[in-house]
A protein has these predicted regions:
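Short S/T/G/P-rich N-terminal loop/turn motif that feeds into the first structured element of a domain
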Residues: 7-10, 25-137, 145-298, 304-321
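Short, low-complexity disordered leader/linker segments with a strong preference
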Residues: 1, 19-26
Length: 321
């Protein structure tokens, strides 16, 4: 098995997100366990010749998990590009990498890259579902690299490494409310806004475990700003106007979510800032708003690895049966 997870040492971020690990490990079952809903989060690459089979296997996995007690939702999202405004690059670089990864895929220079969110009502339900070994056994065989050769394609002996971890949602929001309680977050995860025409972002960072309490406070405050602000500020609909390359307008985030690794990795802790926006431009312009920048200051100051914030499009999603 060539599974990689969150729980080793030597953490890093790749250009596409969390760095796969060199060693395999089962999901932890002891220590302080998470309470409330959890997400088994995975990032993995698929060679183009393997993509159809991999997608079929994920559909079958979703259909199986949908019948498991405690299952809430599954979303598969394909990476298409990267945010530049999260890096504080000059505004002239806004949106320049929005579809760069997708262009690399089309040019035959990159594999498919996916993020998979598997949501359960609680940690025991996730463990009992077998989602972790099921991914390894059912999707893992389709993750081999494939190289062209004169005599025909060559398939790697081992699957390409993938990343996985269990995350807790510590806060979420939509255009109606900011959610911190278990019932509200459970409903949010069961009924996400995952339409394919929307833009997903997932900002990957690590902080020092000792800073977790303050970071949680600051990152939830940032979520509130991202969820409630818009431009122009006098927009009659209280949502904002569509962002574009040549303006600084943006509509409120469609939804926002802060996911925290349920387990520390040595002295570090991983977070995902997961948002859904009407467009890339809405997201990028939100980073130019002084209100967002002020709220982001304390969050950025605590980050020791990151940020890496890819853009994704939802490939498919499935709820409980």
């Amino acid at each position: 098995m060539n599974r990689r997870d969150l729980f080793g040492t030597g953490l890093a971020l790749a250009a596409t997100g969390f760095m796969p690990r060199a060693e395999a490990a089962e999901l932890p079952r002891g220590g302080t366990l998470p309470r409330g809903p959890v997400t088994l989060y995975l990032e993995f690459r698929v060679a183009p010749p393997e993509n159809a089979a991999a997608m079929s296997a994920i559909w079958e996995l979703a259909a199986s998990l949908a019948r498991r007690p405690g299952f809430l939702h599954l979303s598969l999202k394909q990476m298409v590009g990267d945010s530049t405004m999260v890096k504080n690059y000059p505004e002239s670089y806004k949106g320049i990498l929005a579809e760069a990864y997708l262009d690399g895929l089309k040019a035959g220079r990159q594999p498919y890259f996916y993020a998979l969110f598997i949501r359960f009502s609680d940690y025991p339900a996730l463990l009992a579902s077998g989602a972790d070994p099921a991914f390894a056994h059912e999707i893992g065989p389709h993750l081999h690299a494939v190289a062209a050769a004169p005599a025909g394609p060559i398939r790697s002996k081992q699957p390409m490494a993938w990343y996985q971890g269990v995350f807790e949602t510590i806060a979420a929001g939509n255009r109606s409310a900011i959610l911190r309680d278990v019932p509200g977050i459970t409903t949010f995860l069961r009924q996400p806004t995952d339409a394919p025409d929307l833009t997903t972002v997932a900002n990957h960072v690590f902080i020092e475990e000792a800073d977790r309490a303050k970071f949680d406070h600051d990152v939830v405050a940032l979520l509130k700003v991202a969820q409630e602000t818009y431009q122009p500020e006098d927009a009659a609909d209280l949502i904002g106007q569509p962002g574009a390359r040549d303006n600084r307008w943006y509509r409120k985030a469609v939804s926002t979510e802060i996911l925290r690794n349920a387990f520390p990795d040595g002295t570090l802790r991983a977070y995902l800032m997961h948002g859904v926006w009407d467009s890339v431009w809405d997201h990028e312009n939100s980073h130019l708003d002084p209100r967002f920048q002020q709220a982001a200051g304390p969050v950025g100051a605590a980050v020791v690895i990151g940020p890496v914030e890819p853009f994704y499009r939802t490939t498919f999603s499935a709820g409980a049966i």
